[in-house]
């Protein structure tokens, strides 16, 4: 089953962040590690990471979509500390991607 933003935004976000972290051609190692850390935090919160492609082959668009997916979560789920920490790490990675 493929991660779907509508049915499981947590897993979709984690999968996108994992894909960005795995992109060794476009993403510098330090930013990749931030994305992998964010994906790991989301897995701790219950996400199931799957291999999915980057959105349009673009790491920046993929991180932005992951953050958008987290915004679809209900308030209680988003307030979970690992989810908040993952959102912060993703935001920091997005900023550094330029």
Identify the residue ranges that each predicted region occupies.
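Short terminal alpha-helical segments
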Residues: 1-34
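Short amphipathic alpha-helical heptad-repeat segments
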Residues: 5-12, 58-66
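Amphipathic alpha-helical interaction modules
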Residues: 21-61
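Alpha-helical repeat scaffolds in large eukaryotic proteins
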Residues: 18-21, 37-46, 67, 71-74, ...
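Amphipathic alpha-helical binding modules
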Residues: 62-98
């Amino acid at each position: 089953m493929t991660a779907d933003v509508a049915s499981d935004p947590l897993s979709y976000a984690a999968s996108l962040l994992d894909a960005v972290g795995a992109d060794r051609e476009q993403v510098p190692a330090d930013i990749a590690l931030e994305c992998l850390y964010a994906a790991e935090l989301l897995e701790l919160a219950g996400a199931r990471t799957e291999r999915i492609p980057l959105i349009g082959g673009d790491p920046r668009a993929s991180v932005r979509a992951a953050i958008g997916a987290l915004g679809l979560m209900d308030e209680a789920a988003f307030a979970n500390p690992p989810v908040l920490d993952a959102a912060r790490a993703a935001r920091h990675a997005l900023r550094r991607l330029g």
